[in-house]
Design a protein with these regions (language model features):
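Vicinal oxygen chelate
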Residues: 1-2, 46, 88-126
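Mid-chain, well-packed structural core segment of small domains
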Residues: 70-85
Length: 126
């Protein structure tokens, strides 16, 4: 087996404008492609940031996350940052609420969580 890296991470959102604004305008992802899929009546936006590719699907009437944040499947996305404090300040200036900064008990590194418009947990970690 020759797995090299994660190719892309798909995310399902409920609101096209809110999700696009959050990931592009607030977090700084750039748009690679943006497509409406009439056969599914949904949108697919491919985003990229520093080698990370997200597929953002906007699908009407999907069920909400079943629990916070413990549910089978993907638990959250974690982004590496140089400084959690600086990143928290930047997020807060943009109106994004973050949880209190804490230390990862296994690595001793600072970390915290914030949430996308559909309450997908996102982590920043030094």
């Amino acid at each position: 087996m020759n797995l090299k890296k994660v190719h892309h991470i798909p995310i399902i959102g409920s609101n096209y404008e809110q999700s696009k604004h959050f990931y592009v305008d607030l977090l700084g992802f750039s748009i690679i492609r943006e497509n409406y899929r009439p056969e599914r009546d949904d949108y697919k936006i491919d985003l990229q940031l520093d080698g990370i590719e997200l597929e953002l699907f906007i699908i009407k009437n999907c069920p909400k996350r079943p629990s916070y944040p413990e549910a089978y499947g993907l638990r959250h996305l974690a982004f590496a940052v140089d400084s959690v404090e600086n990143t928290v300040r930047e997020l807060n200036k943009k109106g994004i609420i973050t949880e209190p900064i804490r230390f990862d008990i296994y690595t001793g590194k600072k970390m915290t969580f914030f949430y996308d418009p559909d309450n997908l947990p996102l982590e920043i970690h030094e």
